Amino acid sequence: MDPNQGNPLEPQDSPEIPKPSLNLSSILAKSTLPQEPPSMVGDRLPPKTGAVVIDMGTGTCKVGFAGQARPTYTVATIVGCQPQKPATSGQPVMETFIGEAARKRPELTLVQPVHSGIVVDWDAAELIWRHMLEHDLRVATRDHPLLFSDPPFSPSTNREKLVEVAFESLSSPAMYVASQSVLSVYAHGRVSGLVVDTGHGVTYTVPVFQGYNLPHATQRLDLAGTHLTAFLAEMLLGSGLPLGQQDLDTVENIKHRYCYVAPDFLKEQARPELECRQTLKLPDGRTVTLGKELFQCPELLFSPPEIPGLSPVGVPTMAQQSLSKVAAELRTDLAQNVLLCGGSSLFTGFQARFQTELLRNLPPEAHVVVMAQPTRNFSVWIGGSILASLRTFQSCWVLREQYEEQGPYIVYRKCY
């Protein structure tokens, strides 16, 4: 049972719809996607009936065809709405904008359909999916199987809803729902590992063994990229730089380009302020001088602020706690496959600091291998691309006729 599943009322097992098993260990070892330049990915002609992989996160939604090395399109997970009165009738209609097009229009009401990795507004989520599938990929969804990623801690009803949307709204011929952490493991060509994922809305550590999550050892921290951006914006305001809502992209740009993780926070903090200062030129021509803010921002991932009633721990301690909760016979294998994933793990210095602190928290004899792929912000999507393109996976799709016979509960039989 995975960490997402609660105790749903499931229909009795049906012998005619067995849950296929995959021997992925040997398959994934041989399955590597071509490492082509990103510009080439979008230039491919889309297959007429190829599977489409959809990974919707708090910050961005990634979409592309199975078998490709990277998602073809990445769009901000934002929908902007404004009433518009048509010329032919008096009834106002709602005009919508997706992604950056919405963020750049201050007159719009913005909706973020995903909070802390979980879809909370299905209408807005469907608008984004339709836009990316029909407008960006230019495909007819009735011709393409759809693979959706599903985050840890999502309610089981969300998986049922994904099945309904895929078949009822998008008219897909087949679909599948896959665990995000399991897909991240597949992206590394493995079936077991400790996934350390810090993205835009949430951070979690999930042990995965032989393609299955270990829910009892999963850790969660409700602090990630969006919180770092807000913290940096607060420090920029304190330095005298006026910021509006439309400047959040500027703050994000500063965070990604200039912020770094200090090897030793106390030593870095003790450096003279002048040694740390950098003068940055912003896209609009303004300049801002920053110093210790550049490493104080991502430090939150290692020393999160206390919350009333809670004492959250940093990401390395979360990983150590996950390892301590798994069976001793699994610990060595997982410790040698610690997989950094998510865009907030891309800071310069993150991997080295994480490994140093994790080793400090483990017994001296522990052997730890931390892997950090350059494309780890796409790990979930890449894992989905690999899985959906495997020949042995094709019997695992939830088919339309199975949905029509069994309803959305079919997801518990055929999907992880």
Swiss-Prot record:
The record lists its disulfide bonds as none
The Gene Ontology CC terms held by the record are: acrosomal vesicle; actin cytoskeleton; perinuclear theca; sperm head
Write down the InterPro entries for this protein, in alphabetical order.
Actin (IPR004000), ATPase_NBD (IPR043129)
Gene Ontology biological-process annotations:
acrosome assembly; fertilization; single fertilization
Q: Tell me which UniProt keywords the record has, alphabetically.
A: Cytoplasm, Cytoplasmic vesicle, Cytoskeleton, Fertilization
Q: Where in the cell is it found?
A: Cytoplasmic vesicle, Secretory vesicle, Acrosome; Cytoplasm, Cytoskeleton, Perinuclear theca
Work out whether the entry's keyword set contains ATP-binding. no
What family classification does the UniProt entry report for this protein? Belongs to the actin family.
Subunit arrangement?
Interacts with ACTL7A.
PANTHER family referenced in this protein's UniProt entry, alphabetically: ACTIN
What is the protein's name according to its record? Actin-like protein 9
Phylogenetic lineage = Eukaryota, Metazoa, Chordata, Craniata, Vertebrata
